[in-house]
Amino acid sequence: MATNRRTTQEAHERFNVTTFVDEINRRHRASYRVLEEPNPPEAIIQSKGKTSWVEVTSASMNRSFAEESWSHATPGEKPRPMPSEVIIGPDAQFAANFAATVKKKLEKASYGPFRDKYGPGYLVVSVQYPLYGRDTPRFMRRAWQATQVEDQGCFRSIYLVVRRYRGYQVILWRHARNDA
């Protein structure tokens, strides 16, 4: 089962890298392409001699939602449905999980060799939250402002990949802090 989960996770990461690279190419009229998939990071990308790297992570509303999603997507894995209960403050739950997920990545020193070789990379956060709406970023900013982070300087920017009605939207997340 671990092999199936890993295969599913790699497909998910590859999808998010492709979605991100396609959008960056469109926005900036660039020609980035994936050179390698060392894992970690998920991809080494290059455009006209400029090389960078991409790390992908996922942020879900809560652990139960993540477990249900992964078990549903992974062939042969026993389904683990979310409990049938009222979810109070889903935006706040998602925002807290998002802040914890991003904090963990920003504080991870093991990305240092990639930063040193290619410069700061891109952190792509796959938003696994079906209720994401216009108020969600406000909750995310509040949760982020309340989070203490020892940023290792490994990422130049953070992008969100958010599911929309007819596809996905790539959003630059501006996470400026008052204390920075």
Give the role of each language-model region.
Residues 1-38, 57-180:
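Metal-dependent nuclease catalytic core centered on acidic motifs
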Residues 33-35, 44-47:
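Short secondary-structure boundary/capping segments within folded domains
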Residues 41, 49-50, 166:
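Beta-strand-connecting loop/turn residues
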Residues 43-45, 52-58:
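Conserved catalytic cores of phosphodiester-cleaving nucleases, focusing on short active-site segments
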Residues 50-52, 122:
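Structural motif
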